[in-house]
From Swiss-Prot:
Entry protein name: L-rhamnose mutarotase
InterPro entries: Dimeric_a/b-barrel (IPR011008), L-rhamnose_mutarotase (IPR013448), Rham/fucose_mutarotase (IPR008000)
Protein's gene: rhaM
GO biological process: rhamnose catabolic process
Swiss-Prot/TrEMBL catalytic activity: alpha-L-rhamnose = beta-L-rhamnose
Amino acid sequence: MKREAFKMFLKPGFEKEYEKRHAAIWPELKKMLSDGGVYDYSIYWDKDTNILFACQKTKGEESSQDMGANPIVQKWWDYMADIMEVNPDNSPVTIPLPEVFHMD
């Protein structure tokens, strides 16, 4: 099991839309993540900075950040690109966050 955290950047004024889209996450995306070993995945929003903090666990070495070649992921990126800071391929700009403390 591996834990990973990273931050992403939400464009101002799109908080409710971001929540709405994730409340209706595509079943095929959820299945692909789960089949890929991603679980216990949460995203938190800092309303003062519009930074999104994501935390996830994986059963293997691959995380959601390694699944960008999958067409389902690419379609999701395109769907979310208008409300997030993105790279030229529409992947969200992400910055890995090193773990500095953990308690079971």
